[in-house]
Amino acid sequence: NRDKELADPQGFGLIEYAFSRMAADAGIDMSECRLHQEGGRSHFMTRRFDRTSTGDKLHMQSLAAIRHFDFNAAGAYAYEQAIETIRRLGLPAVDIEQQFRRAIFNILIRNQDDHVKNIAFLMDRTGAWRLSPAYDVAYAYNPSGPWTRQHQMSLNGKRDDFDLEDLVAFGGYCGFSRRRALALVAETSAPVSAWRAYADDAGVYE
């Protein structure tokens, strides 16, 4: 995974913060986050979503756990299987739309550490499942590395070199019309095109 393959550069907390804010503006459900400054370093802090407001634990299962998928098997699983799981759990349509946005966002920002442990589900006290907020959402790409040179999960049968028709086809699998899929892609991509503004606001400089 990214921890094995990519170094944790100084200032990565700032990068995570910028991407978290960008993802939220792209319509992705993100936990509240902030930066903690300490000793000249910036630490990315995010509120735990597997706890209630009173601190009680919520049951959480990753896609890997709930489907018995091996997250080390790069390319063995697909975003379509995440959608299939959402349907099998009987989750609402908004969760399908959420997962669509997250897949598109990962492709647009080259978050290629998008393995099956980075999608999760929460069960509340009544036993009802929901898609958890997104996490580990940041640029992760190493063209010479065995792990993140391609996406960990495929989409429309591909792990790289996606085009708009691939995203529309995935939207069709999610149950969206072509028009709706294109609208969601546009909404998700708009903040990505403003990366420099998010980076500057977070203090990320070239």
Predicted feature locations:
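Conserved ATP-binding subdomain of kinase catalytic cores across diverse folds
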Residues: N1-A74
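Conserved kinase catalytic-core segment
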Residues: Q10-A26, A78-N142
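Generic, well-ordered alpha-helical scaffold segments in large soluble proteins
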Residues: M22-D29, F49, I66-F69, T85, ...
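Small/polar glycine-rich anion-binding or flexible loop at a beta-alpha turn
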Residues: G39, L182-S193
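Catalytic-core segments of enzymes that bind and process phosphorylated/nucleotide-bearing substrates
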Residues: S62, I66-T85, D124-R179
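Regulatory N- and C-terminal appendages and interdomain linkers associated
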Residues: W129-L131, P143, Y173, A190, ...
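Short, surface-exposed acidic
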Residues: F176-V185, E206
